[in-house]
Swiss-Prot record:
This is Isoleucine--tRNA ligase. Its EC number is 6.1.1.5. It is found in: Cytoplasm. Catalyzes the attachment of isoleucine to tRNA(Ile). As IleRS can inadvertently accommodate and process structurally similar amino acids such as valine, to avoid such errors it has two additional distinct tRNA(Ile)-dependent editing activities. One activity is designated as 'pretransfer' editing and involves the hydrolysis of activated Val-AMP. The other activity is designated 'posttransfer' editing and involves deacylation of mischarged Val-tRNA(Ile). Residues 1-24 are annotated as: Disordered. Residues 1-16 have a biased composition (Basic and acidic residues). One of its GO terms (molecular function) is tRNA binding. Monomer. It catalyses: tRNA(Ile) + L-isoleucine + ATP = L-isoleucyl-tRNA(Ile) + AMP + diphosphate. Its cofactor is Zn(2+). The gene is ileS.
Length: 966
């Protein structure tokens, strides 16, 4: 009988023969969009996070250090995933009794905010004004984002977040810079760095993304200049070389770099051919001759070969020399192991200002910085002094360069070519490598000795740190290892306004740092601590340098924003939030301050990366014990979220329409190690899952509404057997749930909770229990035993779900725990200690068998119902034939077996064969009890109550029925 039907029946009969149908203030409808904001306000008003911390005072700390989101724009679904995952971990760890600390943070400096200030107020503002407006803008953005994060049910120290723009944090960042300078990691040099013309600044590796780009691909000939050396290398007469024009041919997809060419590269071990063609002699890699001649539409014959090593230092004319005397220079061949013969001619042209390998090759051959030709300015335009192309942007110059090469007679082929190319992640525009004078943290420099002993390089220290770190999922370790192993020096400097200054004084003539730089940095940091980075702008050098001020100038570079967030283990954990986050015991143990860093998979090259490098320089260790990575959100078809596609999902919209609890349950039920798919259809399924869990909770709370554990608790030995089984099953599941939480695995917890609610409880235990709960005497031992089990199940279940269904668990807890020590909130309690059941293993095995029998019985009952012979299962009587342990289990229940199988009678006999299970269903010939709806022979045995069966008569007016098993 359904609860609704019983309620209607009870009402219609005016409780003539009442059943124990109780109610609860916990409603069936969650009405989440309306109720959740009330919970958020209540948590804020009673300072819930502070209460939780107070309850855990003195406990071991668990520190999840927040990777700061950028203070610009509304939060998106990726932010929601990130914050909910963090919140679930903090709550799950807190429920173990740990002092789980969460201080949210924001990344505040950098280009995106500068762009917003330019949009609102125009370009050309004084630096101080830009900084003031940027600070105000970031503050406003943080307020907006904070509201949305709290709306998601995320608990943390929202009253005291950390901000990279806080004066103290800015000052401590300068102190961190001073520290790594003293240790010998920082140097200044000319190097090609990732450069964005729109940013007007160098970019970090993490700020570069790759997209397809269509470029002009060209094959360019560099005319022979040293025939005698070529003749010697190829072992042919010099007259043969001189007899015809000749070129060494290169292939490139960046025509704009040709004006800056200063060398050519060949592989020392590759064989190169001197090829005779109708156009003249060509030098190509031997294995590329056939393919390249087709491209050039030429016939040809190899007349000699030589290794790349034999061609070393031979020089060739610049291909634009005939067009303008400014290009009248020679390009030597340098050997390079990186040259391949997969595509092109097997020869690479080298413009050291615009390629990392080009630069390294030319520097290795003694080219001084002053000789490097670098005509491209920071805005992507050639300097006006560049012959032929001065004043043009490099992209506009590409076709002009091709025309000039054609006119000079040195172009062999040009065509459009699609390839993966570097783009700025902010502007989505192509970027280049550009040699500029920058400040670097050297990956392979030898740091200063400590205590007279050599210190490993930054690369070595960081790689060792990775080996000492736990990764969730495990594949993250190799990914980060590969990035660190292969990365170039870290470009620390940026050419921006809204950022922490690299507050150095540089000698005007020599470019050398002031000899008292560490001391001066501390003096500047003290000013920044009081006035913010603006203090550097207003500082008169004479205040610190005295008479030397005229010899020095302020360095105008700012620090990479990845240094801002990458040093928060120093500026926040050891600095501004030391009282909350710093754990001296962890520091003394191994120096790793945070238990966990958790971010999206892009942060292997972002925050995980920069934090590892800064901590390796400062302490020689990572700042974290473990790294957890989550995937990106995609739509139901696996496509990335994109405004242009129109498939973006707003967490604010979901919270307002369905409830933040639905976002939380979606995050928890998804395997975050891969992509997280979200769509309307997926969210509908999540809503259904939520309803099932909520309905289970409502049933539990309703049937516990007259239960007081202090008065009605019974020892486990006095419970019915099925109750002991249900609690044993709960205890078994609790071990699995806590094990998953310990490993940061949430989707198995949700899956098991759903199965527990729908199959173990709704599909079995609660289904069996309804008769006992509703029909036995209210204060009978049989009913109180059932309530004992429900109490323990509810305690455990509310704690399992609290980390992800926080609003719902808290709402249910207020009903369930009313009047207890933890009435205020579930989050100051700990995971429930589910009582031990002595015969748990035997019970679990026995009732597993009984449930298998029940499943077969249900199938047989359904077949008979479909035939129209019965309506409900209570109209049926069963005869079951079984053997072996199955027979033993069935017989052990006696008359209680009918309650387990939801029939009015169940008879068990031995089967002909031990392994048989035969079920016979017979429609009952007896009358139906008006109260319990069972069909029994004793209905009407008491003439005073002719519509009641014997047990209902006894439960209402006599001593009550006796139950042992179910």
């Amino acid at each position: 009988m359904s609860d609704d039907k019983r309620a209607k029946s009870d009402k219609n009969e005016k409780n003539k023969y009442p059943v124990n149908l109780l109610d609860t203030p916990f409603p069936m409808r969650g009405d989440l969009p309306k109720r959740e904001p009330q919970w958020v306000k209540q948590w804020q008003d009673k300072q819930l996070y502070k209460k939780i911390r107070a309850a855990r005072k003195g406990a071991k700390k668990f520190v999840l250090h927040d990777g700061p989101p950028y203070a610009n724009g509304d939060i998106h679904i990726g932010h929601a995933v990130n914050k909910v995952l963090k919140d679930m971990i903090i709550k799950a760890r807190g429920l173990t009794g740990l002092d789980a600390v969460y201080v949210p943070g924001w990344d505040c400096h950098g280009m995106p905010i500068e762009i917003q200030i330019e949009k609102k107020f125009g370009k050309g503002l004084p630096v101080q004004e830009v900084q003031a407006k940027a600070r105000a803008y970031a503050t406003e953005q943080i307020k907006r984002q904070m509201v949305d994060f709290e709306r998601l049910g995320v608990l943390g120290d929202w009253d005291h977040p950390y901000l990279t723009m806080n004066y103290r944090n800015e000052a401590d960042e300068l102190r961190a810079l001073g520290k790594i300078m003293e240790k010998g990691y920082v140097f200044r040099g000319l190097k090609p760095v990732n450069w964005c013309f729109d940013c007007g600044s160098a970019l970090a590796e993490a700020e570069v993304e790759y997209k397809d780009k269509v470029d002009l691909s060209i094959d360019v000939g560099f005319p022979f200049a040293e025939a005698d050396k070529l003749a010697h290398a190829f072992k042919v007469p010099v007259e043969q070389i001189d007899a015809r024009p000749g070129w060494i041919v290169i292939w490139t997809t960046t025509p704009w770099t040709i004006p800056s060419n200063q060398a050519l590269n060949v592989h020392p071990e590759v064989e190169y051919a001197l090829v005779d063609t109708p156009r003249g002699h060509l030098i190509l890699a031997t294995e590329r001759v056939e393919e390249q001649l087709k491209v050039y539409a030429l016939e040809g014959k190899v007349i000699a070969t030589a290794t790349g090593a034999a061609l070393s230092e031979i020089r060739f004319h610049h291909p634009l020399a005939k067009m303008d005397g400014g290009y009248d220079r020679l390009s030597p061949i340098y050997l390079g192991d990186y040259v391949t013969t997969d595509t092109g001619s097997g020869i690479v042209h080298s413009a050291p200002a615009y390629g990392v390998e080009d630069f390294q090759s030319c520097k290795a051959h003694g080219m001084p910085d002053s000789d490097i030709i670098s005509p491209v300015m920071g805005n992507g335009v050639y300097a006006g002094t560049l012959p032929l192309f001065g004043g043009l942007s490099i992209w506009d110059a590409n076709p002009r360069i091709v025309e000039a090469l054609q006119e000079s007679g040195n172009l062999f082929n040009s065509h459009k070519y699609t390839h993966s190319y570097m783009h700025c992640w902010r502007h989505k525009t192509p970027i280049i490598y550009r040699a500029t004078s920058q400040w670097f943290a050297g990956m392979d420099v030898d740091p200063a000795e400590e205590n007279g002993k050599p210190v490993p390089t930054l690369r070595e220290t960081a790689l060792a740190g990775i080996d000492a770190t736990e990764f969730y999922p495990a594949w993250g370790k190799q990914r980060l290892h590969n990035m660190i192993a292969n990365r170039p020096d870290w470009t620390l400097s940026r050419q921006r306004q809204w950022g922490v200054p690299m507050a150095f004084f540089v000698h005007k003539e020599t470019g050398a740092l002031h000899p008292r730089t560490p001391e001066l940095l501390e003096a500047i940091a003290k000013r920044v601590e009081q006035q913010g980075i603006e203090a550097w702008q207003t500082l008169d050098p004479a205040e610190l340098l005295g008479d030397e001020a005229s010899q020095y100038e302020k360095n105008r570079d700012t620090l990479d924003v990845w240094f801002d967030s990458g040093t928060t283990h120093w500026t926040v954990i050891r600095g501004s939030h030391r009282d909350d986050l710093y754990d001296p015991s962890a520091d003394e143990a191994d120096g790793r301050l945070a238990d966990l860093y958790l971010e999206g998979s892009d942060q292997h090259r972002g925050w995980f990366h920069s934090s590892l490098l800064t901590a390796s320089m400062l302490y020689g260790k990572p700042p974290y014990k473990a790294l957890l990575t989550h995937g990106f959100t995609v739509d139901g078809e696996g496509r990335k979220m994109s405004k242009s596609i129109g498939n973006t999902v707003s967490p604010q919209d979901i919270a307002n329409k369905m409830g933040a609890e639905i976002i939380r349950l979606w995050v928890a039920s998804t395997d975050y190690s891969g992509e997280l798919s979200i769509s309307d259809e997926i969210l509908k399924r999540v809503v259904e899952s939520y309803r099932r869990i909520r309905n289970t909770l409502r049933f539990l709370l309703s049937n516990l509404s007259d239960y007081d554990h202090g008065k009605h608790a019974l020892p486990a030995a006095e419970w019915l057997e099925i109750d002991r089984y249900a609690v044993a099953l709960t205890a078994q599941l609790q071990k699995e749930v806590l094990s998953h939480y310990e490993a940061y695995e949430f989707h198995p917890v949700v899956a098991k909770l759903q199965t527990f609610c729908s199959e173990d409880l709704g599909g079995f235990y609660l289904d069996v229990l309804k008769d006992r709960l509703y029909t036995t005497a209210p204060d009978s031992k049989a009913r109180r035993a059932a309530q004992n089990a429900l109490y323990h199940i509810t305690q455990a279940m509310l704690h399992w779900m609290a980390p992800f269904l926080s609003f719902t668990a808290e709402e249910a807890w207020q009903v369930f725990a009313h009047g207890t020590a933890h009435t205020d909130t579930i989050f100051t309690s700990t995971y429930y200690a589910v009582p031990e059941v002595d015969d748990a293993d035997d019970l679990l095995q026995k009732w597993h068998t009984l449930r298998e029998v029940r499943a077969e019985v249900t199938r047989q009952l359904e077949a008979v119902r479909v035939e129209g012979e019965i309506g409900s299962s209570l109209q049926a009587e069963l005869t079951i034939q079984a053997g072996g342990p199955v027979l033993e289990a069935l017989q052990s229940l006696g008359d209680d077996l009918r309650f387990v199988l939801l029939t009015s009678a169940a008879k068990v006999t031995a089967a002909p064969e031990a392994g048989d299970l035969l079920v016979t269903v017979t429609p009952s010939a007896h009358a139906k009890c008006e109260r319990c709806w069972h069909y029994r022979a004793d209905v009407g045995h008491n003439p005073d109550h002719p519509t009641l069966c014997g047990r209902c008569d006894s439960n209402l007016f006599g001593a009550g029925e006796h139950r042992s098993h179910a």
